[in-house]
Structures are given as structure tokens and as C-alpha cells.
A protein has these predicted regions:
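Conserved small/polar residues in nucleotide/adenosyl-binding loops
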Residues: 223-228
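Accessory "access/gating" subregions that flank catalytic or transport cores
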Residues: 151-222
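N-terminal amphipathic, basic-rich helices that act as targeting or association modules
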Residues: 2-140
Length: 233
């Protein structure tokens, strides 16, 4: 992590100290015209500042945001890294098959298959599968879920193996709710935090929760720009 604009600041909440990336510090240290950016653009910029490594994210990538207010565009690819990935079963199961195939290929070359894992945390919500065979009684819900497990036992055994085998991968079982509901009520964190080792120091990072979904309308919770300004102060 380069932190070319010296943006790292700390915030103490209770007994924990969190490190975040301050826009005020970035402006003070040469990154101009960013305090009035739209909040969605601020989220992208914070992502680049936090992940600056000189290779996938360079100082020039970050500086390009200086001109966004004037041009309303950025003239380069943005290497955005979401905090997490949300999948439903139609697209998620093939992805787990791909990961398993990659592990098999590495194993055949005498490599370590355990090195193949999602880089970002992934939640796979099984919400497209349950059929309605029983209805009109208090036991209908349980009966339909039980039938789903019987019909697709191989799929669920495979996904259980995936959850146990891969890092950064969780499965939400059928009958829990649709992925958007589960995301909003259980998975979304608004502010994401993680422990990360940076220059031999263990830091608790805090940053906006962002999600990439394998669905046309995956929803995400965000804290408001007012709240962001308060934290930045």
C-alpha cells in the first residue's frame, strides 16, 4: 500500500482503533477538487486510494479524479475491488465448479490446490431453487424445503464441500429468502472492516461496504455523505 497522498487516519470506537482513508488529508496533500464529488464517485476514489500499489492502482489513476468535476469522465480503466461478491445459485454454482476445476488442474501439476480461493468474500444465496409442491397448511414451508434437499442432494453436498474447502466463501441455504432480502437484512455491513498487515503493522481498516452481484438488480447499503464527512473530520 503506497498511500501517496498520506491519507491514513485513525478513529477510535470503544476499545478498537480503526484506520480509514481521509479525503481531507488527500486534498491537503495535493489531490484537488474531490470534496464536492458525488458520493458514488467518492466511493470509487476511496477504493483506489486504499488499494494503491503502484501496479494495479497507480498514483496517476487516482490523480485522474481531479478532473472529474470538469469532464464528468475518467480517461482510464478503474481497478475497482469490491468488498464482497453476492451470488445466487444459477450463476454461483458454475463459479464454484470453475474454482474446483482450477484446483484439480493445479493438483495435476503437483501444485498446492489450497491456493485457489476467492480474493473477495463471496456469499452464495440459494433462492431460485425451491418449488411449491405443498401449500395451504402450517407445514407447507418445511415440506417444500425438505423436498428441495431430496431432489438436489448432489448439488447441496457439492456446495457444502465448497464452503468447507474455500476461504472467503459462504452458502446461504434454500428457504432463507431471496438474495436481495438476505443481502439487505443480514449480509450488508454499511461500513466494512477487516484486519490487514501493512508494513509489518496489523491494522483494522474501515471503509465503505461495496458489493458486486451476479444479478441485474443487486442492492447495496451505503452510509450517507454527511456521515462520511463526520468520519472524515
Amino acid at each position: 500500500m503506497y498511500d501517496s497522498f498520506k491519507t491514513k487516519k485513525t478513529l477510535k470506537i470503544g476499545k478498537k482503533t480503526y484506520t480509514y482513508f481521509s479525503f481531507k488529508a488527500a486534498e491537503k496533500n495535493g489531490l484537488k477538487n474531490i470534496s464536492s464529488l458525488p458520493f458514488s464517485i467518492k466511493v470509487l476514489l476511496e477504493n483506489l486510494i486504499r488499494n494503491e500499489d503502484g501496479t494495479t492502482v497507480s498514483v496517476d489513476d487516482i490523480k485522474d479524479f481531479d478532473n472529474w468535476k470538469t469532464n464528468k469522465k475518467i480517461n482510464r480503466e478503474i481497478n475497482f475491488r469490491p468488498a464482497r461478491v453476492l451470488m445466487q445459485d444459477f450463476t454461483g454454482v458454475p463459479a464454484v465448479v470453475d474454482l474446483a476445476s482450477m484446483r484439480s488442474a493445479i493438483m495435476s501439476e503437483k501444485g498446492d490446490p489450497k491456493k485457489v480461493n476467492p480474493l473477495s468474500p463471496v456469499d452464495l444465496v440459494i433462492d431460485h431453487s425451491v418449488m411449491v409442491d405443498k401449500y395451504g397448511s402450517a407445514t407447507s414451508y418445511k415440506a417444500n424445503v425438505d423436498l428441495e434437499y431430496k431432489r438436489n442432494i448432489e448439488r447441496y453436498e457439492f456446495l457444502r464441500w465448497g464452503q468447507k474447502s474455500f476461504n472467503n466463501f459462504r452458502v446461504v441455504p434454500p428457504g432463507t429468502g431471496i438474495c436481495h432480502q438476505v443481502n439487505l437484512e443480514y449480509l450488508a455491513k454499511t461500513v466494512w472492516s477487516e484486519k490487514k498487515k501493512i508494513k509489518n503493522r496489523n491494522l483494522n481498516l474501515a471503509y465503505p461496504d461495496t458489493v458486486v452481484g451476479t444479478d441485474s438488480h443487486t442492492t447495496c447499503l451505503l452510509y450517507t455523505s454527511d456521515a462520511a464527512d463526520e468520519v472524515d473530520g
